């Protein structure tokens, strides 16, 4: 099921797929508490739960569809779209903290097909050996070429990874149709 949320506060749109049939699974990454002392202040102060997340209450407030999808671990591949600083990366991090899933963050500017293949191989192992799903957060996903975008399609179609794209550009224009669908 594909949902689109207009974000009036940041003039962006959050596109996401929601699996309504999945039961609630929650957990916390044991290593997320040990933040690097040398990380940027914004990363150290970043909200870790939906209750700490400020703003966007029309989509992540109590009882709202996106919040329910995150809390029940039924959020599928998604694209977060909006201007810098509106909470796209923070919301993706909250998804990682709220669900019991593995979370891998890549930047489209510095990552290539080889990096994606490594993530997919590790995700496939996690799924087969431990039954643990993997989210791939790709910052600035609009900067990926068609070849790079096509490299994750088989893994998405087979359910090996869940994709969260973060972009400041309209994904309907800047990304390949196969990824957006």
Question: Model regions: which residues?
Answer:
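Cysteine-centered motifs
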Residues: 7-10, 16
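Walker A/P-loop
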Residues: 27-34, 68-106, 153-154
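Pre-Walker A (pre-P-loop) alpha-helix and adjacent loop at the N terminus of AAA/AAA+ ATPase modules
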Residues: 35-78, 83, 122-125
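Short glycine-rich substrate-engagement loop in P-loop NTPases that contacts/grips substrate
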Residues: 61-63, 103-134
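Walker B catalytic acidic pair
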Residues: 139-140
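Conserved D-loop-proximal element of ABC-family nucleotide-binding domains
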Residues: 145-147, 174
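Short regulatory helix/loop adjacent to the ATP-binding pocket of P-loop NTPases
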Residues: 153-154, 170-181
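Structural recognition of the conserved hydrophobic beta-strand(s) that form the central parallel beta-sheet
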Residues: 162-166
């Amino acid at each position: 099921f594909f949902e689109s949320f207009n974000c009036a506060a940041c003039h962006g749109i959050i596109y996401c797929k929601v699996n309504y049939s999945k039961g609630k699974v929650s957990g916390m990454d044991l290593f997320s508490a040990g933040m690097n002392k040398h990380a940027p202040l914004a990363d150290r102060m970043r909200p870790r739960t939906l209750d700490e997340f400020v703003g966007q209450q029309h989509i992540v407030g109590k009882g709202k569809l996106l919040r329910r999808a995150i809390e029940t671990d039924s959020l599928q591949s998604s694209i977060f779209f909006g201007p810098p600083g509106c909470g796209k990366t923070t919301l993706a991090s909250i998804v990682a903290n709220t669900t019991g899933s593995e979370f891998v963050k890549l930047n489209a500017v510095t990552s290539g097909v080889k990096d994606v293949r490594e993530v997919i191989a590790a995700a496939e192992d996690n799924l087969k050996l431990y039954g643990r799903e993997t989210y791939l957060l790709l910052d600035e996903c609009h900067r990926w070429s068609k070849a790079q975008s096509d490299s994750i399609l088989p893994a998405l179609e087979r359910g090996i990874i869940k994709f969260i794209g973060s972009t400041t550009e309209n994904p309907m224009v800047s990304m390949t149709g196969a990824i957006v669908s």
